Amino acid sequence: MFDDVNIDDFYKLGFTYSSMLDMIPKKFETYKYTNATNGGGIDIDPQAAKMMRKFQNIIKEHLIQKYFRVEALGYEMWNGVPPDLRLFHNDYFHHKKGYNSNVFIFIDECTDNNMNYIEMRTGLDEFYQVFPNKFDMIWINQSEQFTYKMIHTSGKNRILNFRYYIHGLNNKTNWEM
């Protein structure tokens, strides 16, 4: 599980990814997702919330704890992109949130019809556009030097978001390990 995750990319680029195609139940394609585009509250179906808690623990125990001491801090599921994620930002440093890492799972594939992707900035002139496949997981490092934004142009963009606090995460020293 998560054998294809490249921890060096997490340290140096601010993200890494893995396919969860065989792990995410197809049921997630049938749930109702809150339209996040307007910035309103996020509602989660109780059955989906039960599965989200399980996935949050699986990601914590089988991925993040391989490398870090970590606390799981919550989860959301939405369609579109919340307004505060549309500009380059760092949730921990700019938005003063209590988490410094996210795991996003994309329910919908990025296609020509729905250009939905993440841009990661690792410096002033270095950034990466990450175009997820269906059920891809993208693990975001929110150390001080990394920022990201989400792009949603059209169509469905259903996302599962898991928030974590990783103790001692500071890539300015960690990436040289």
Where are the regions a protein language model picked out?
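Intrinsically disordered, low-complexity segments enriched in small/polar residues
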Residues: 8-9, 13-15, 29-31, 73, ...
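Catalytic core of non-heme Fe(II) oxygenases with the double-stranded beta-helix
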Residues: 76-145, 149-151, 155-159, 165-177
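Non-heme Fe(II)/2-oxoglutarate
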Residues: 1-71, 85
